[in-house]
Amino acid sequence: MKHIKAIIQPDKLSAVRAGLANTDSYRGIIISDIMGQGTQKGIVQAWRGEKFQMDLIPKVMIDLIVKDEDVDKITKIIYDSSRSGEIGDGKIFIYHVENAIRIRTGESGNDALV
């Protein structure tokens, strides 16, 4: 099993979710609003004629746990749906998951994901 963590632009979330809706390769998703700074180093905004620097930029973090054989498919959907080619598009991280246990039934491993 793998943990896919994607950090994307907030305006790309609908496209990512629409892409993921067309697959049965995952059963659950966690979506979090976050703030972050990367290569972009913040943005300059104006309010009432005054300019100010925003060091932390709003992003969305998506977490999914998937079977090993579904990692490439899910990663491609997220990548294709969220890429604009501009700085600040985000990142996708993939981690190994030792085990998963469904609390309700006690099922573990891949059985806990379905």
Residue locations for each model-derived region?
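Positively charged, small/polar-rich N-terminal and surface patches that mediate targeting and assembly
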Residues: 1-114
